[in-house]
């Protein structure tokens, strides 16, 4: 068992179904909508690794599938907002697939985050990033945004390099070590997600009293 597993506790299907509790729903959010993006390749790879664990329900959520114009811009069709709200509300936690744009996250991801508030609150998230320096600077920016939205973000952070984990910058071919990094991140994410679900449940009980 790795140091991280000893420290945070390795999550498995039996641990997350004790007492008949419902399995956690984890949304893998693709953070880019641009033409020619590689985030779908990264997202499907993360989902494939996660599904092998059998410890939660994992679903890829593509921002591009929702009609989300710039928030507050007059005369725009924001018909996708209600569907976006419903989908995010269904999730217990998230894995954000993040690419770096000028030291930050994409405008589409920031916009999608800004559309909602309570749907994000008291949930947990992990981050998988990529870029010339592994998307590290975008990740640090995203952490500040997630904190403001009351999303607890785990420390372990798989960082993919455009130089070593991609071929010609377009074909995703991760090094073997990256799979372990993703699993270590999920090992942290699931206990945090379970804990935050308890927070939401307790808050609901208080509100109903």
Please annotate each region the language model reported.
Residues 116, 120, 146-150, 193, ...:
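Short, well-ordered alpha-helical segments in soluble proteins
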Residues 121-163, 177-181:
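Short, glycine-/small-residue-rich phosphate/pyrophosphate-handling segment
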Residues 2-115, 172-209:
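N-terminal beta1-alpha1-beta2 submodule of the flavodoxin-like/Rossmannoid cofactor-binding fold
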